[in-house]
Amino acid sequence: MAPQHKLHRQTPPILGLLDIGTAKTVCFIVAAARRGREGPVDVLGIGQQPSRGLKAGVVIELDAAEQCVRAAVSEAERAAGCELRQVLLAVACGRLKSTTFAAEATIEGRAVMDADMARLMSAGRSYVERDGRALLHMNAIGYRLDAAQGIADPRGLAAKVVSVDLHAVTADDAPLRNLVHVAERAYLSVIGLVPAPYASALGVTTPEERKAGVMVLDFGAGTTGLAVFVDGHLLASEVVPVGGHHISFDLARGLQTSLREAERIKALCGTVLAGADDLETPVPFALAGEEGPRTAQAATGKVREIVLSRVKGLHGQLAERLERASIGPGATARVVVTGAGGQLPGLSSFVGEFFGKPVRAGHPQAAYGWPAGAASPAYSTVLGLAQVAFDPAAGVRRSERHFRGGGYLRSVGRWLQASF
C-alpha cells in the first residue's frame, strides 16, 4: 500500500471542494479550521454557476462543462483572494455500485501485523477492480480471527486466519476520467474522488444516527443518491439516474408545454401530497409549438398525477438497489431526505410511507459552522466533502501523491478509509 498520511492541521492547506452537478456547479475554497474554531473548515470563498454539458451527472459536452467549472472556481477565488490548485471532487456518475465481500489472510497462529492488514486491503482492491471498474471508496465493516467475530482492530491478536468484511464503492472508468478531465482543463489537480451519496450523507447526519442505522436520500436535478449506514459503517452508496429534471420533462410531455413552463408549473403546484382539497383548481400554461400565444389549462390533480407517477417509479428503483445490497427494512431506524429536489411538497411524507420509517429533512449540520447562506440541502454534498477532507472523525486518508488523469484512477485504490 502506498504511504498515506492525514491532512496536516498545523499549517492549514487550501483546498477546493467541487460538486459538478446536473443543475449547478459549486466550488468552496476552504482551509482546515484554525485552533479553537468550531468545525472542520474555514470557508474562504464560494462560487456557484448553472451547469451545462452534463446529463444525469455524466459529462456530455466537455467544453461547456469546463466553462462552468472555470466560472465557479473563478468566483470562489475572487471571494477567497487566492488561487486554487487542488480539489476534492464529488462523483455521481459512472453507475456507482456498492459491493460487500470478505477477504482473508493466513497468519499461522502469530499476531496480526500491519503487513497483514495491507494484504487484506490489497486483496479487496484486486477483487473489486477485476472487471475494470475504478475503486472510489472502501471501508472495513468488521474483522474475524478464526471463529471469533465482531473484532474492531485485530492488530496484536493471534490467530491462524484473519479475515475482514469489506464494503466497496466502484464506478465505470470512462465517466470518471471525463469528470477528472473537466477539472484538469480548468488547471485543477484532483486529489480525491468521493462518492456523492456518501458525502451528502456525512453532511446531514450525526454519528449517533449512523450508529443507529440511517438511510439518506439526496434528490438532485438529474440523479438521486442513496446511502445507508448501519452500526456506523457505510453499507450502500449508489446513484439512480433520475431526479427533479425528469419530473419537469414528464410535465412538459404530459401537458404539451415547454420545459420552462413545466418548471414553473412544478414550482407552483407540484406535489405528491394525497387528499389535497384543491385538486380541481385550473392551472393555465402556454402550449408548446403553437403559432401565437395559445394557452391551455390543467387541473392541479393532473399535475399531481404526473409528478406522483415519476416519484413512484424512482422509489421502485431505490427499493431494487436496497434489495441488491441485501439491506432489509429493519437495518435502518430512519430516513433523511436532502438535496434541492427533496423540497418537493409531500415528498418526505411519501418517503416515510414507502419505507415505513420516520423521516426528517437533512440540512448541513449547523455544528460545523457552515456559512448561513450555504445552510441548504442543496449544499449537503459539499459539506460532506469538507468532513472527508479535514475532519479526523471521518477517518479518511489520502495519498501523498497528487494524481492526474489515468494516473489518479489507477492509484485511487490507495486512498482508502482509515478504519482499516
Residues of each region from the PLM?
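Acidic-glycine-rich active-site phosphate/pyrophosphate-binding loop
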Residues: 42, 219-223, 227, 351-366
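Hydrophobic, well-ordered secondary-structure elements that form the walls
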Residues: 318, 337, 385
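Short glycine/threonine-rich loop-to-helix capping motif typified by GTGT followed
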Residues: 206-208, 340-354, 375
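Nucleotide/phosphate-binding catalytic cleft detector across ATP-hydrolyzing
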Residues: 1-24, 28-215, 233-235, 244, ...
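Glycine-rich beta-strand-to-loop/alpha-helix junction loops that act as flexible
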Residues: 89-94, 333-343
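Glycine-rich phosphate-binding loop of actin/hexokinase-like ATP-binding domains
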Residues: 212-254
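Short glycine/serine/threonine-rich phosphate/pyrophosphate-binding segments
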Residues: 25, 201-202, 212, 221-227, ...
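A general structural motif
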Residues: 310-319
